[in-house]
Curated annotation (Swiss-Prot):
Chain's role: Catalyzes the formation of 6,7-dimethyl-8-ribityllumazine by condensation of 5-amino-6-(D-ribitylamino)uracil with 3,4-dihydroxy-2-butanone 4-phosphate. This is the penultimate step in the biosynthesis of riboflavin.
GO cellular component, one term: riboflavin synthase complex
Protein name: 6,7-dimethyl-8-ribityllumazine synthase
Coiled coil residues, start to end: none
Catalytic reaction equation(s): (2S)-2-hydroxy-3-oxobutyl phosphate + 5-amino-6-(D-ribitylamino)uracil = 6,7-dimethyl-8-(1-D-ribityl)lumazine + phosphate + 2 H2O + H(+)
Gene Ontology annotations of biological process type: riboflavin biosynthetic process
Subunit structure of this chain's protein: Forms an icosahedral capsid composed of 60 subunits, arranged as a dodecamer of pentamers.
Residues reported to bind (2S)-2-hydroxy-3-oxobutyl phosphate: A84, T85, R126
Transferase is among the record's keywords: yes
GO molecular function annotation: 6,7-dimethyl-8-ribityllumazine synthase activity
Domain of life from the UniProt record: Bacteria
Pathway(s): Cofactor biosynthesis; riboflavin biosynthesis; riboflavin from 2-hydroxy-3-oxobutyl phosphate and 5-amino-6-(D-ribitylamino)uracil: step 1/2
Length: 154
């Protein structure tokens, strides 16, 4: 038997956790995610957005939303750009671990849509210019994973 998640968003309820830090990037990621969800038939009323101060706070809020039982998927959006200190490495590692842990603990797909880039230019490219929109890609993954898990439970 093969299991595959369909890209049909009808009747799905999705939460998006988005960092306000680097909002000139995360705002574009959010637009891409919401637009993609709606284009895949997720009702706009079934999309909830939670804003957090920075990427480090994303896993906690994602866990709260995923644990609520109200959502078929949670999308995490943020942007961490390397600076002159090692802070970047700590934040990226902990956020990735945190999001992964939420997946394991809740059995709700929590999609990692957090940019970790070396420069502002790379972030801009991944937020809707040369390299597509990673928020839109995260939305597609959320729909697919939510439907995949539903098909396995059936």
């Amino acid at each position: 038997m093969n299991f595959e998640g369909k890209l049909i968003g009808k009747d799905l309820k999705v939460a998006i956790v988005v960092s306000r830090f680097n909002d000139f990037i995360t705002g574009r990621l959010l637009e891409g995610a919401k637009d993609t969800l709606i284009r895949h038939d997720v009702n706009e009323d079934n999309i909830d957005v939670a804003f957090v101060p920075g990427a480090f706070e994303i896993p906690l809020v994602a866990k709260k939303l995923a644990s609520s039982g109200n959502y078929d998927a949670v999308i995490t959006l943020g942007c961490v750009i390397r600076g002159a200190t090692s802070h970047y490495d700590y934040v990226c590692n902990e956020v990735a671990k945190g999001v992964s842990k939420v997946n394991d603990q809740t059995n709700v797909p929590v999609i990692f849509g957090i940019l970790t880039t070396e420069s502002i230019e790379q972030a801009v490219e991944r937020a809707g210019t040369k390299a597509g929109n990673k928020g839109a890609e995260a939305a597609v993954s959320a729909i697919e994973m939510a439907n995949l898990l539903k098909s396995i439970k059936a």
